[in-house]
Amino acid sequence: MALVSLKLQWADGADTSVPLPAYETSGAAGADIRANCPDGPVTLAPGARALVPTGLRMAIPQGYEVQIRPRSGLALRHGITLVNSPGTIDSDYRGAVGVIMQNLGDAAFEITHGMRIAQMVVAPVVQASFELSDSLSETDRGSGGFGSTGGD
């Protein structure tokens, strides 16, 4: 497994005692990232969303991105997910990282200081060149979409 060096820095006002992102198992693809809200918890009412600070800034190597993804346990047990999943942090962004969380559950949910709120996955980036064409190659699927490949 290749290791990519990701430089981290505390954002202004962050509590530097909050643990840094960490892989919880040797086979984990995503490192858990935590809420850094030293001024108090963030309460999400049902249907509400909020930008939750992580207290981190990062320098992602060129040719990579960081994807921010929901934690499955929060989604299953509480209906907590991320609005723009996966969220992308580009290699040229240097600002504070926040996680846009949403409560799809039936009860209010409290995001506490230091809570594991999301996973971050470091992934390679491939950029494409875009060009208009007079024709596209034919496929068996053609223009079928939105459920066209299955019976249900």
Curated annotation (Swiss-Prot):
It catalyses: dUTP + H2O = dUMP + diphosphate + H(+). Its EC number is 3.6.1.23. SUPFAM superfamilies: dUTPase-like. Substrate binds at R71, S72, G73, N84, T88, I89, D90. The keyword Transferase does not apply. Its cofactor is Mg(2+). Pathway: Pyrimidine metabolism; dUMP biosynthesis; dUMP from dCTP (dUTP route): step 2/2. Belongs to the dUTPase family. This enzyme is involved in nucleotide metabolism: it produces dUMP, the immediate precursor of thymidine nucleotides and it decreases the intracellular concentration of dUTP so that uracil cannot be incorporated into DNA. This is Deoxyuridine 5'-triphosphate nucleotidohydrolase. The lineage of its organism: Bacteria, Pseudomonadati, Pseudomonadota, Alphaproteobacteria, Rhodobacterales. The gene is dut.
